[in-house]
């Protein structure tokens, strides 16, 4: 039986690979997509998500979400993903539009209609998820679990200790981590290991139309990384759903720092139980890299 999931995303180049896997992995049933400001503005992430859905002829409803963090000024990753977030490939024009309600309400409505609890997957800042949990607490029993790409037990990627998705809206992340729902955190500890090799990347144009599109996106903004390998950060959240045996998880207490001058956005992961607090997150700490690479090749081969 396929696992029903809702995907909250901010595409973004590596988001495109994660979306492909969510659509084409035969084990998954992607029922709803929502967008959030993150890598680029929410208007651009929505446009990019709709372009991808049209490219794959996927009839999946999409709702536009939060344009700004809960309390602080927006930050983006334009330096990584470019001004549009997904330049480098000429997508066909289309007439698709997002749903007419905010993302968190679309998630609420879909959860309440679902015949069984649904797994939420968040691969951008957690603003929409925090709004859902704070404004619609009655939805919690209908959430099977939340799987996120975000955070780190060690080094960061936008500050010395903070990972971008958490640092983009620390207050939202703190709200989510305090919520009591089951959380699986695929942070930089594993995503920095999730590398597609230059040899595999070179085969993408001959794989299928998805391979050609992804190769064009990668080459446009990450041409240097094409020679050393590309980290598939967001894809790890999807991979865990399908191939959890590839990941080593440890239950830990995790809090999000929201006050520190230099540490805001840091996920404080109490690996050794120093704080004496009960675990609230299953933290992915290691990855079977070869198994991950094999799975990626298998699922992208299906993304015709």
From Swiss-Prot:
SUPFAM superfamilies: Nucleoside hydrolase. InterPro entries: I/U_nuclsd_hydro_CS, Inosine/uridine_hydrolase_dom, IUNH, Nucleosid_hydro_RihC_nonspecif, Ribo_hydro-like. GO terms for molecular function: purine nucleosidase activity; uridine nucleosidase activity. Its EC number is 3.2.-.-. The keyword Transport does not apply. Hydrolyzes both purine and pyrimidine ribonucleosides with a broad-substrate specificity. Belongs to the IUNH family. RihC subfamily. HAMAP family: Nucleosid_hydro_RihC (MF_01432). This is Non-specific ribonucleoside hydrolase RihC. It comes from Escherichia coli O139:H28 (strain E24377A / ETEC). The gene is rihC.
